[in-house]
Amino acid sequence: MLHPRARTMLLLSLPAVAIGIASSLILIVVMKIASALQNLLWQRLPGTLGIAQDSPLWIIGVLTLTGIAVGLVIRFSQGHAGPDPACEPLIGAPVPPSALPGLIVALILGLAGGVSLGPEHPIMTVNIALAVAIGARLLPRVNRMEWTILASAGTIGALFGTPVAAALIFSQTLNGSSEVPLWDRLFAPLMAAAAGALTTGLFFHPHFSLPITHYGQMEMTDILSGAIVAAIAIAAGMVAVWCLPRLHAMMNQMKNPVLVLGIGGFILGILGVIGGPVSLFKGLDEMQQMVANQAFSTSDYFLLAVIKLAALVVAAASGFRGGRIFPAVFVGVALGLMLHEHVPAVPAAITVSCAILGIVLVVTRDGWLSLFMAAVVVPNTTLLPLLCIVMLPAWLLLAGKPMMMVNRPKQQPPHDNV
C-alpha cells in the first residue's frame, strides 16, 4: 500500500501529465504555423516577386506591415491580445480566455514577421489561462495557483525540451516554510514538465548547444575572466533596462496600437537592414548561423549584439507579443564571441557562457534559469563550477537594480493596450 503522502502526490499526476502534453502541443502548433508563414514571407514570396530576401526594402516592408497587422489585432480583438509583455513577468496571473485567440494570432505574426522576441511569454500566458479555466471546471477543489504552477512547468519543459529548467526554477519558488518536503511539492510540476518535454521531443528537438571548442581544465584566471565577461554583459543589459520604460512611455503616448506597432515595425526593419537577416527573428536558429559563419569579425559580432539588443528593446516597448529570453541569449552569444575574438587567450566557451549568464540574469533576474541557459548553450561539465562562482559577483552587481520590466500605468486596464 502507498503511504498517504504518495497518494497525495499522485492525485494531481494525471492532470499534470495532461497539462504538460497540452502545453507542448499548443507550442508545437503555434511554432509550425509561424514557421510556415515565415517561409511564405521570407522565402516563397520574395522568390516569386524576384526580390532578394535580404533586400532592405523587403526587410523594412515586411516588418512594418507585421507591426501594423499586430497592431490591428491588438486594437480590435477581444481582450486586446492579452497583457503587454513589457509589463509582465514570465509567469503571471491568468488572463481571460477571450483574450487568447488575439494573443495567439499576434504571436504568430510577430514570430513569422521577423520580430526580435521569442514565444515564451505568450505561450506561457495561453497555457496558464487554459489550465486555470478548464481545471476550475473539472476539479474545482484545486486552487488557481496549483493550475498556474502545473501549466508553467509544462510550458517550461516544452520550451526547453527538458524538465531540468522547471526543477531549478520551482525549487526556489516552492521552497517555502511548509512542513511538506520540497520534492513532494515538486512532484506534480515535474510530471507536467517531463510530459511537456517528452511531447516536444516527439516532434522536434530544441537545439540550443553551439559547436564551440571544448573547455579543458579550469584555472584561477578563468574565474576572473568569466566574472569580467559577465559584468560586461550585465552592463550592456542594464542599458536596455534603462531604455525600455522610457521608450515604452514615449511610444505609448500615441495611444493607438496600430500606429505604435507600425512605427515599431519600421524601426525594427531599419535595425534589420543594418544587422542583416541574422539579426531578425527570435534568435535561436540565427545564433547557430552566427557561430557557423567564420567570416564574422570582432566588429561584426559587436554590431550584431548592439542591433539585437536594440531590436529587443524596441519590440518590447512597442507592445509586440513575445518573450525576451531567447533574443537575450543571442545577444549573449554575440557578446561572448566578440570578446573571444578581441582577447583570443580567453576560451570562447568561457566568454560565451558567462556572457549568456550575465545578460539572461539581467532579463529574468533568475539565477537558476541563467545558469541553465549558459550550461545548455555551451554544454561542458567543466564549466559548471566556474559558472556557479561567476554567478556570485554577477548577483551582487544586480542586487537592488531595476528589472527589465515596465511599471503598468495606473489608468491602463489590466489587459488593454489601447
Curated annotation (Swiss-Prot):
Q: Might you report a single GO cellular component term?
A: plasma membrane
GO terms, molecular function: chloride transmembrane transporter activity; monoatomic ion channel activity
The protein's location, in the record's own words, is: Cell membrane
Which cysteine residues pair off into disulfide bonds? none
- Indicate the principal place this protein occupies in or around the cell: membrane
Q: How does it sit in the membrane?
A: Multi-pass membrane protein
Keywords for this protein: Cell membrane, Ion channel, Ion transport, Membrane, Transmembrane, Transmembrane helix, Transport
Q: Which residues cross the membrane?
A: 10-30, 54-74, 99-119, 120-140, 149-169, 186-206, 223-243, 258-278, 300-320, 322-342, 343-363, 371-391
Q: Which family does it belong to?
A: Belongs to the chloride channel (TC 2.A.49) family.
Q: What is this protein called?
A: Putative ion-transport protein YfeO
Name the gene: yfeO
